[in-house]
A protein has these predicted regions:
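Conserved donor-binding/catalytic core segment of Leloir-type glycosyltransferases
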Residues: 183-203, 209-212
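Donor nucleotide-sugar binding/catalytic pocket of nucleotide-sugar-dependent glycosyltransferases
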Residues: 131-181, 188
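A charged, aromatic-enriched C-terminal amphipathic alpha-helix characteristic of glycosyltransferases
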Residues: 333-367
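Short hydrophobic beta-strand element within catalytic cores of glycosyltransferases
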Residues: 290-299, 314
Length: 371
């Protein structure tokens, strides 16, 4: 089975799943060679049969098209997998033109699918755009359930989850042992809450500092470690000072050594991501750390589904700092003596669903490569 993967660009975190697909499937890769984004991009030289001749061009406002797509001879493929970018005219063209007068490739979208916050107009546009799609690879069950509510065919909806560099992280995980890294830094045995990622406004990390401040006034003391850097670092430092937490916060900074990141996460007791948790959920659970994030799922990223309340973390009411404080306090009140049990639950969640091997199996099963 010949497969075409056609995307404007690909972030570097997808390296593991794409390399696995490249190894085990007959795939040609098509990306826009000129596409620029603020995130780190994949090194396309890691993939065989990679074509970068397409160019992403602006048509009007946010609307784009892929210059050169018509010359790719996509009719020769059995399956085309693309991103489902509704604001891209080329993807509309692809869904309309494929198969006219020739054998039609099946077209799958690897996409968020549905958020649950769409307006009536957005719903109409999406349904019209999706009507000729043969199948969807969705990041989560939430999106699948939202699409079922909208009347989509269940047989076309396939949950593929997401993944990071699982195999390399697994080797690091096997090396991990408990260490006094936080006791040495803070000089106490208080539980440590970690956040790993960019310190940006959308992460709403000020809520975490305020919540820990509330708990400190009630006699509950916690350490906080921020592993990452970003625009909000100064503001967070000021918030810590205002809440009497200067000595309880460690701004570790950005760390690009995954073994060090693993050690910092493994030895923490809880991750709190008051904004959208996204990839952070997979990262921390890979190394056995549970996570708390908000419960307004239409504003979440798909990885929130790795949080199983009472097992791998918990949720708090979106934007409610008092409820975040309650959630943190409740977690430690009920789980402080079950750290290793929680660690194993986090491992199990990632090992079962959030890894490239799971994703590849979904692709092979859906495409009929394995049964």
């Amino acid at each position: 089975m010949k497969i075409a993967m056609l995307f404007p660009y690909t972030p570097s975190y997808r390296e593991a799943i794409y390399k696995l697909m490249d190894k085990e499937l007959d795939v040609d890769w098509f990306f826009c060679g000129n596409a620029k984004r603020s995130l780190k991009m994949l090194d396309y030289s890691l993939l065989s049969h990679c074509d970068l001749t397409m160019e992403e061009k602006t048509f009007l406002g946010p609307v784009v098209y892929y210059k050169g797509i018509k010359g790719l001879n996509l009719q020769r493929y059995d399956v085309i997998i693309c991103a489902g970018v509704i604001r891209c005219l080329s993807e509309w063209w692809l869904l309309q033109k494929m198969g006219k007068g020739m054998r039609k490739p099946k077209i799958f979208l690897w996409t968020h699918g549905w958020y649950g916050k769409e307006t009536k107009v957005q719903k109409l546009i999406k349904k019209f755009f999706f009507r000729k799609v043969d199948g969807f690879f969705l990041y989560g069950d939430y999106a699948k359930n939202e699409m079922l509510k909208e009347g989509f065919d269940a047989g076309k909806l396939h949950v593929i989850k997401n993944s990071l560099d699982y195999d390399n992280q697994l080797e690091l995980r096997k090396e991990m042992t408990l260490s006094p890294i936080y006791k040495d830094h803070f000089g106490n045995d208080n539980p440590t809450i970690v956040f790993i990622g960019r310190l940006t406004a959308v992460k709403k990390l000020d809520l975490l500092i305020k919540a820990v401040g509330i708990l400190k006034q009630k006699g509950e003391e916690y350490n906080m470690a921020f592993v990452g850097d970003g625009e909000m670092r100064g503001g967070l430092a000021n918030a810590a000072e205002e809440n009497g937490l200067t000595n309880d916060v460690w701004f570790y900074g950005a760390c690009f050594d995954e073994k060090t990141n693993a050690r910092l996460v493994y030895n923490a007791d809880l991750c709190v991501a008051p904004g959208n948790i996204g990839l952070t959920a997979m990262h921390v659970m890979m190394f056995g750390c549970p996570a708390i994030s908000h419960n307004d799922f239409k504003w979440q990223m798909p990885e929130f589904e790795s949080i199983i309340p009472g097992q791998t973390g918990d949720f708090f009411e979106y934007g409610n700092v008092e409820d975040l404080a309650r959630s943190i306090s409740h977690w430690f009140a009920t789980k402080s003596n079950s750290r290793e049990e929680v660690r194993k639950a986090c491992y199990q969640e990632i090992d079962k669903h959030w890894n490239p091997h799971y994703q590849l199996n979904v692709i092979k099963t859906v495409l009929g490569i394995i049964r």
